[in-house]
Amino acid sequence: MSAATDEILEKLKSLTLLEASELVKQIEEAFGVSAAAPSGGMMMMAPGAAAPGAAAAEPEEEKTEFDVILEEVPGDKKIAILKVVRGITGLGLKEAKDMVESTPKPIKEGTGKEDAEDIKKKLEEAGAKVSVK
C-alpha cells in the first residue's frame, strides 16, 4: 500500500461510530452511490460460506484419494516387505530398499479407497506397520 492509503486507513480506524455514519452519508452524496444492502430479500453469501446450522446438516464430503504410508519395518521382516513394496510400486531393488529403510515413507499416493486398503493389507501381512491417510 502507498503512504496515502495507509494514512487514510489509520484515520478510518480511529473514527467513532457516529463519525463513520456521517462519512458514509457524505460518500453516498459525493459519488452518487448507495451503501445499502441489495434488496433481494435474501443476503448474498461469499462462496464457501454456509448459513448457521447448515454445516451440521450437510454430510462431510467423502474422501476419494488416499495415501498409503509405510510407518515401520521390523528388521526380521524387511525382505518380505521389500518384495511387497517392489510389487506395489514397480521400483527397482535399490529404490525399493531405500524406501523401506527410510520410514515413515509414502508407498502409494492419491489412490482409491479399495486399492489403499488392499495395499495396506498386503504390507501388514508381510509384517509392516502401515497407515492410510
Curated annotation (Swiss-Prot):
> Which Pfam families does the protein's record reference?
Ribosomal_L12, Ribosomal_L12_N
Q: Which domain of life is it from?
A: Bacteria
The answer to keyword Calcium applying to this record is no
Provide the GO MF annotations for this entry. Answer: mRNA binding; structural constituent of ribosome
Q: Which biological process terms from the Gene Ontology are attached to this UniProt entry?
A: translation
- Matches recorded under PANTHER family: 39S RIBOSOMAL PROTEIN L12 (PTHR45987), LARGE RIBOSOMAL SUBUNIT PROTEIN BL12M (PTHR45987:SF4)
**HAMAP family annotated for this entry?**
Ribosomal_bL12 (MF_00368)
Subunit = Homodimer. Part of the ribosomal stalk of the 50S ribosomal subunit. Forms a multimeric L10(L12)X complex, where L10 forms an elongated spine to which 2 to 4 L12 dimers bind in a sequential fashion. Binds GTP-bound translation factors.
Hey, which family's this protein in? Belongs to the bacterial ribosomal protein bL12 family.
Protein's name in the database: Large ribosomal subunit protein bL12
* Species per Swiss-Prot/TrEMBL record: Crocosphaera subtropica (strain ATCC 51142 / BH68)
